[in-house]
């Protein structure tokens, strides 16, 4: 394994660990904001189960995406998090939270996220994920470009 690929793997493992650690705070903040906007009170006893369900929904895909070879179309770690909002959505629906209005773009692009809980950036999950997310993305791009150069000149 080339040095840059080993470094990419290390960055991926660091990001996996940090995302896993950040899920609880992200779920809690997201549920509190959506519940408040939706006119319902948070039942804190329900949060632990939803945090764990969200973790179970997100982390296998996060691991797969971040560990994937750069030449394999693997998707996005943020898409994996956006696709894991189901437990939060179900909880907010059960509580009777009003869903915010959404335009056609949001309806079409994120049909499973009626409360707009999914992150657009790593910093939407946790500010501490911003830099590791950028570093991982840059390292992935570097490895991809190096391989392209080598195959073009090899």
Model-assigned labels for residue ranges:
Residues 1-75, 83-154:
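Extended, amphipathic alpha-helical stalk segments that mediate dimerization
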């Amino acid at each position: 394994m080339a040095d840059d690929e080993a470094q990419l793997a290390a960055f991926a493992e660091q990001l996996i660990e940090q995302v896993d650690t950040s899920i609880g705070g992200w779920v809690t903040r997201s549920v509190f904001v959506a519940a408040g906007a939706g006119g319902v009170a948070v039942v804190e006893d329900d949060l632990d189960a939803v945090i764990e369900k969200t973790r179970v929904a997100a982390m296998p895909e996060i691991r797969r995406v971040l560990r994937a070879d750069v030449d394999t179309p693997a998707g996005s770690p943020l898409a994996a998090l956006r696709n894991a909002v189901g437990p939060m959505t179900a909880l907010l629906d059960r509580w009777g939270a009003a869903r915010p209005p959404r335009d056609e773009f949001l309806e079409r692009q994120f049909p499973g996220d009626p409360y707009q809980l999914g992150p657009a950036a790593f910093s939407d999950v946790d500010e501490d994920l911003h830099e590791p997310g950028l570093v991982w993305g840059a390292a992935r791009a570097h490895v991809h470009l190096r391989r392209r150069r080598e195959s073009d000149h090899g």
